[in-house]
Design a protein with these regions (language model features):
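Phosphate-binding loop of NTP-binding sites
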Residues: 103-177
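N-terminal leader/targeting and accessory segments in enzymes
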Residues: 1-104
Length: 177
């Protein structure tokens, strides 16, 4: 029960590729099946499983992110239009967007809609993970608390965690930076 309250359950929001593209402001090519279900939205290929969607936001090399994501079974990868044209022109699974970072932001805002959890963000140069874990453990004893992903010190961690946030959570403790 402790781990369930500490990490929470995924918020059940059925998401198709077509709906995701509208949320993030992207236009799907005609050849892409907009009714395909999106399992998880990520920014890093290391976490991709079949059915996931990736937004290559520019934190990592686009060629590597797109290629590895597709190899691992991502149904689509959104990336900057210039990179799509230069590197992946012939692959319909790679979808051009004007501003990939803005796409991540729009998705996160949509994802947290309806969730009223208060947030505690832990930053600094030393002790973030320990402090986040300690505060999360203490908070989980009294409140429905979501705490950070085990590999939270990366750009994609907040995106991975926000997909676990539910309206039932009262607090969200997140390591940042």
């Amino acid at each position: 029960m402790f781990l369930k309250s500490l990490f929470g359950k995924s918020k059940e929001k059925s998401l198709t590729l077509g709906k995701l593209s509208k949320i993030i402001g992207a236009e799907l090519p005609r050849a892409v099946d907009g009714s395909a279900l999106c399992r998880t939205v990520l920014t890093q290929p290391e976490y991709v499983a079949p059915g996931d969607v990736v937004i290559s936001a520019g934190w990592y090399d686009h060629r590597r992110v797109v290629s590895q994501s597709l190899e691992k079974g991502a149904i689509a990868v959104f990336c900057p239009a210039g990179k799509k044209a230069a590197l992946f022109q012939d692959d319909d699974r790679v979808i051009a967007v004007e501003n990939a970072l803005e796409c991540v932001k729009r998705y996160e805002l949509w994802r947290e809609n309806g969730c009223k959890a208060k947030r505690i963000a832990i930053s600094g140069s030393v002790g973030k993970t320990t402090t986040t874990g300690l505060i999360g453990s203490v908070m989980a004893g009294c409140f429905r608390t979501l705490t950070h992903h085990p590999m939270a010190n990366s750009h994609g961690a907040i995106l991975r965690n926000i997909q676990k946030l539910t309206p039932a959570h009262e607090w969200w403790v997140q390591e940042v930076g």
